[in-house]
């Protein structure tokens, strides 16, 4: 599931091409018709679907129908900027993971890097966790901690954390399936 640039998706696609990677990406779903990540779906010939998020019920109903039709059993949220309902999550209990650009449980939600810098944290990082009905609150699978540099900006921090996300997401998937 994606909403934007798809850089974590691109990393997962590249890693999934390795014969040792434990999952195959069989479908990409987006709520944003302009999500740059959909270009990766086209480039790597991966089926994709776009469903408008005019209502969460409409979006989730269509997603569940498509996921069941394709017999997809595990979901990765990669920059998906919507909150899934309890009902949807219940259909995939401990089968949905997400990556978040902070060391959860700190700095849930949006604007993480700004909040981290405003709070004068010494460290930040990223977290892969199971999705639960509460925002960014599911059981933690893996985390990567990085030191915040002197004179760090939101943009430099965002780039550095994203680089770690690309590595951590695949490591987390491997740890789940091995």
Q: Over which residues does each language-model region extend?
A:
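Active-site-proximal loop->helix
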Residues: 16, 38-43, 117-118
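Short beta->alpha connector loops
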Residues: 5-6, 30-33, 55, 80-82, ...
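Donor/substrate-binding cores of folate-linked one-carbon enzymes
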Residues: 9, 15, 23, 74-178
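Residues at the C-termini of beta-strands that transition into short coil/loop
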Residues: 2, 29-32, 52, 132, ...
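Conserved phosphate-coordination/catalytic loops
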Residues: 3, 57, 163
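N-terminal glycine-/serine-/threonine-rich beta1-alpha1-beta2 phosphate-ribose binding loop
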Residues: 22-24, 29-70
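N-terminal Rossmann-like dinucleotide-binding module
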Residues: 1-36
């Amino acid at each position: 599931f994606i909403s934007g640039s798809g850089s974590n998706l691109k990393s997962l696609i590249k890693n999934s091409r390795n014969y040792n990677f434990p999952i195959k990406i069989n479908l990409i779903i987006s709520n944003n018709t302009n999500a740059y990540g959909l270009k990766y779906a086209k480039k790597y010939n991966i089926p994709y679907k776009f469903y408008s998020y005019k209502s969460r019920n409409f979006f989730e109903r269509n997603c569940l129908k498509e996921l069941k039709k394709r017999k997809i059993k595990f979901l990765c949220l990669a920059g998906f900027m919507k909150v899934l309902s309890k009902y949807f999550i219940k259909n995939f209990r401990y089968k949905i993971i997400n990556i978040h650009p902070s060391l959860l449980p700190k700095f849930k939600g949006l604007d993480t890097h700004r909040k981290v810098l405003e709070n004068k944290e010494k460290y930040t990082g990223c977290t892969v966790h199971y999705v639960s009905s509460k925002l960014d609150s599911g059981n933690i699978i893996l985390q990567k901690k990085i030191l915040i540099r002197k004179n760090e900006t939101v943009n430099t921090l965002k780039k550095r954390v994203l680089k770690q996300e690309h590595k951590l997401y695949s490591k987390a998937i491997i740890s789940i399936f091995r």
